[in-house]
A protein has these predicted regions:
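Post-transcriptional modification and biogenesis factors for structured RNAs
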Residues: 1-142
Length: 142
């Protein structure tokens, strides 16, 4: 619940349009999530869907590029072009994205790790990805 709340808060602060989470195998929109979001849950639309892969397909048909985060990504987030309409997929901390979700992503993006630990928690990864998109878009606007 704390990771989801932190992701909602960060997404709202970064200007994201919404968040999509699975109905099954994910935390619900509980009071703990709301508290962890520091009130952002009131402003951030959250869709709970029964089929994430179908939701990704719908986004792609609408012209949204889908970027999945993966330790072994095709490119790093610094080389990913996040300036246009983008959906960022953050996988499960323990298992990452499912095979089907990973296959639906247009790009698999890694966050460079320089230390001994090879992964970030989900909310930290989401924050880095979201604010790289903010950075790229602000540079494109100048």
């Amino acid at each position: 619940p704390h990771n989801l709340g932190a992701i909602i808060r960060t997404a709202e602060c970064a200007g994201a349009h919404g968040i999509i989470i699975p109905k099954r195998r994910s935390v619900g929109l509980t009071a703990v999530v709301g508290k962890a979001s520091a009130g952002a849950l009131e402003y951030m639309p959250v869709a709970r869907v029964s089929n994430i892969t179908a939701a990704i397909d719908t986004l792609k048909k609408a012209g949204v590029w889908v970027y999945g985060t993966a330790a072994e990504g095709d490119t790093t987030l610094y080389r990913a072009d996040l300036k246009s309409a983008a959906a960022i997929v953050i996988g499960n901390e323990g298992e990452g994205m499912s095979r089907l979700v990973s296959e639906r992503c247009d790009f698999k993006v890694s966050i460079p790790m320089k230390g001994s630990i090879s992964s970030l928690n989900a909310s930290a990864a989401a924050a880095i990805m979201l604010y790289e998109a903010v950075r790229q878009r602000s540079l494109a606007d100048t």
